[in-house]
Amino acid sequence: MSVETALPIEFSDAAAAKVKTLVSEEENPDLKLRVYVTGGGCSGFQYGFTFDEKVNEGDMTIEKDSVTLVVDPMSLQYLVGGVVDYVDGLEGSRFLVQNPNATTTCGCGASFSV
């Protein structure tokens, strides 16, 4: 009997598929998607996404479909229960965070407050 442990943040199938495509295009299998939170934006905090080859001490990693999502401990506290997703819509294609901790979110979804 196995017990599944819920991860503090989820990585959607769409986000994992897009990361896999981008990593393949760069021909660098060591690249990982790093999501982070910084001060700024119209709501106080903003999400950031970058590709990174390294994992720092204390970082959380989530693997899905052979790709890795990395979150630093400071950002993780604002992202617990969230979902990193990738959307392709009228506002363009982008990674985003569906964050249950956000009390307000700006119109584009790039910044939030808690």
UniProtKB/Swiss-Prot annotation:
<protein>
    <recommendedName>
        <fullName>Iron-sulfur cluster insertion protein ErpA</fullName>
    </recommendedName>
</protein>
<comment type="similarity">
    <text>Belongs to the HesB/IscA family.</text>
</comment>
<dbReference type="InterPro" id="IPR016092">
    <property type="entry name" value="FeS_cluster_insertion"/>
</dbReference>
<feature type="binding site">
    <location>
        <position position="42"/>
    </location>
    <ligand>
        <name>iron-sulfur cluster</name>
    </ligand>
</feature>
<dbReference type="GO" id="GO:0016226">
    <property type="term" value="P:iron-sulfur cluster assembly"/>
</dbReference>
<dbReference type="GO" id="GO:0005506">
    <property type="term" value="F:iron ion binding"/>
</dbReference>
<comment type="subunit">
    <text>Homodimer.</text>
</comment>
<dbReference type="GO" id="GO:0005829">
    <property type="term" value="C:cytosol"/>
</dbReference>
<keyword id="KW-0411">Iron-sulfur</keyword>
<dbReference type="GO" id="GO:0051537">
    <property type="term" value="F:2 iron, 2 sulfur cluster binding"/>
</dbReference>
<dbReference type="InterPro" id="IPR000361">
    <property type="entry name" value="FeS_biogenesis"/>
</dbReference>
<feature type="binding site">
    <location>
        <position position="108"/>
    </location>
    <ligand>
        <name>iron-sulfur cluster</name>
    </ligand>
</feature>
<dbReference type="InterPro" id="IPR035903">
    <property type="entry name" value="HesB-like_dom_sf"/>
</dbReference>
<feature type="binding site">
    <location>
        <position position="106"/>
    </location>
    <ligand>
        <name>iron-sulfur cluster</name>
    </ligand>
</feature>
<dbReference type="InterPro" id="IPR017870">
    <property type="entry name" value="FeS_cluster_insertion_CS"/>
</dbReference>
<comment type="function">
    <text>Required for insertion of 4Fe-4S clusters for at least IspG.</text>
</comment>
<dbReference type="InterPro" id="IPR023063">
    <property type="entry name" value="FeS_cluster_insertion_RrpA"/>
</dbReference>
<dbReference type="Pfam" id="PF01521">
    <property type="entry name" value="Fe-S_biosyn"/>
</dbReference>
<dbReference type="GO" id="GO:0051539">
    <property type="term" value="F:4 iron, 4 sulfur cluster binding"/>
</dbReference>
<keyword id="KW-0408">Iron</keyword>
<keyword id="KW-0479">Metal-binding</keyword>
